Amino acid sequence: MTLAGRETSRLVAIFATIFLIQIAVVPHFQLSGYVVDLPLILVVLVSLHLNPPNGALVGFLAGVLVDLVLHTPFGMTALTFSLAGYGTSSVASQVTERNIIVRSLTVALLSATATALFAGIGALIGLEYVTRRELGAIALVTAIAALPSTVLLSPLVRWVFPLETVQINE
């Protein structure tokens, strides 16, 4: 099945809304001094409904959008989100059919892993300020924020993808 224009426009609308919320609202509501990464959580949740190449594509496009406002090297977030989307889509067949609790825990675990991956990529390219922070605390805050975010965003993702698995290029 190919992704129709309706699904594409719905997905773009959701990502644009989450992006605007991320840059305008979320920085004012920090958990333990850290900002929650809503676009990452949405990439992981959406990738549960895609095959691995398409999950990587969605992650890349969302990451490029986020890279426009971050003070990290351009493409670092896109790379991290691409890998998160690919990895999430790879385990999607075991998780998509499960209940919301299992899905929330999976999104929390994968989001925390992607946060650690972001710090690892930063260390590889020599960004000390990314790895100096308390990585465990940042990953924990991301995981904790992913639990209610998944419950709130799941109906929107189901609205975008009425079928269980959608493949953009078949």
Language-model regions, residue ranges each:
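Terminal, non-globular segments
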Residues: 1-170
